[in-house]
C-alpha cells in the first residue's frame, strides 16, 4: 500500500545533475633529474614528451589524435602534366626592363628587344657559346661539389635537437666506472677451509654439502679462488 503522504509528494521528472571532481594525480618524474627539471606539471605526459622530442609510447597511438585523410594530405599538391599545352597569356602583363634609344629631345625612338622573344633556353646557350670567348680556368671553380659533409650534417642535426634530448645523450655517452669488488673476510675464511680440506679438487668442493651449503657451481668457486690467489 504505502503512505498517503509519500504518494502526494510532487516528484520532479528532471534528474539531478551531480558533478564529480576527478582528482588527477600530478606526475612527478623521479627517474632522471634532467627530465624532472624540464617537466611542466600543467601538461600531460604526452605533451611533455612531445615537447622534449621523445616518444611517450613505443607503439602507435590507438586513439585521441586527429588523423589526416588522404584527401587532406594531397590537397596542396598540384600535378603538372608535362605534355599539356599551356597558354602563354596569364591574364596579367609581365613587367620587365628593356633598353631603348632616345633622340635629342628625349623621346623614345626604338626599343631594343632581345633576340630570344620566346625565352628559349637553348637559344641563350647557343648565343653565349658563340659570343663569349674561352676564359682561363679557375681551379676553385673546377672543384666538384659532393654535397654536405657528414660532419656538417651531424652539426645541423645536433642544433635542431631539443636541449633535453642533447643533455640525455651526453649523460648516456659518459663512460660507466666499473665497480671493483672486494672479497670479505668471511669469504676468504670459507675459501681457505675448502682448500684446506680438498686442495685443488674444485669438483669435490662443489659436492661438499657441509662446506658448500649454498651449492655454488664449479665455475663460481674457481673464480673466487683465483681472485683470492688460492688457485693458479
Curated annotation (Swiss-Prot):
GO cellular component, one term: preribosome, large subunit precursor
Residue ranges of the region described as Disordered: 1-20, 113-161
Pfam families for the chain: Nop16 (PF09420)
Basic residues bias spans: 1-14
Domain of life: Eukaryota
Biased amino acid composition, Basic and acidic residues: 132-154
Primary residence: nucleus
Compartments where found: Nucleus, Nucleolus
Keyword field: Nucleus, Ribonucleoprotein, Ribosome biogenesis, rRNA processing
GO BP terms: ribosomal large subunit biogenesis; rRNA processing
UniProt KW rRNA processing keyword: yes
InterPro entries referenced in this protein's UniProt entry, alphabetically: Ribosome_biogenesis_Nop16 (IPR019002)
Known function: Involved in the biogenesis of the 60S ribosomal subunit.
Subunit and interaction comment: Component of the pre-66S ribosomal particle.
Family according to the record: Belongs to the NOP16 family.
Protein's UniProt name: Nucleolar protein 16
Gene that encodes it: nop-16
Amino acid at each position: 500500500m504505502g503512505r498517503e503522504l509519500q504518494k502526494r509528494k510532487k516528484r520532479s521528472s528532471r534528474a539531478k545533475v551531480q558533478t564529480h571532481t576527478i582528482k588527477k594525480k600530478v606526475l612527478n618524474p623521479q627517474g632522471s633529474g634532467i627530465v624532472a627539471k624540464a617537466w611542466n606539471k600543467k601538461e600531460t605526459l604526452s605533451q611533455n614528451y612531445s615537447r622534449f622530442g621523445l616518444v611517450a609510447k613505443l607503439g602507435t597511438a590507438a586513439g585521441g589524435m586527429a588523423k589526416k585523410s588522404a584527401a587532406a594530405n594531397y590537397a596542396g599538391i598540384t600535378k603538372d602534366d608535362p605534355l599539356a599545352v599551356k597558354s602563354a597569356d596569364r591574364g596579367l602583363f609581365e613587367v620587365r626592363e628593356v633598353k631603348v634609344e632616345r633622340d635629342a629631345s628625349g623621346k623614345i625612338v626604338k626599343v631594343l628587344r632581345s633576340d630570344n622573344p620566346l625565352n628559349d633556353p637553348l637559344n641563350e646557350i647557343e648565343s653565349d657559346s658563340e659570343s663569349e670567348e674561352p676564359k682561363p680556368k679557375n681551379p676553385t671553380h673546377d672543384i666538384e661539389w659532393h654535397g654536405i659533409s657528414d660532419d656538417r650534417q651531424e652539426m645541423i642535426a645536433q642544433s635542431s635537437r631539443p636541449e633535453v634530448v642533447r643533455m640525455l645523450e651526453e649523460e648516456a655517452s659518459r663512460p660507466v666506472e666499473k665497480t671493483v669488488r672486494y672479497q670479505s673476510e668471511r669469504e676468504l675464511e670459507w675459501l681457505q677451509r675448502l682448500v684446506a680440506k680438498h686442495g685443488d679438487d674444485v669438483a669435490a668442493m662443489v659436492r661438499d654439502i657441509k662446506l658448500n651449503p649454498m651449492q655454488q657451481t664449479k665455475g663460481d668457486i674457481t673464480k673466487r679462488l683465483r681472485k683470492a690467489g688460492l688457485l693458479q
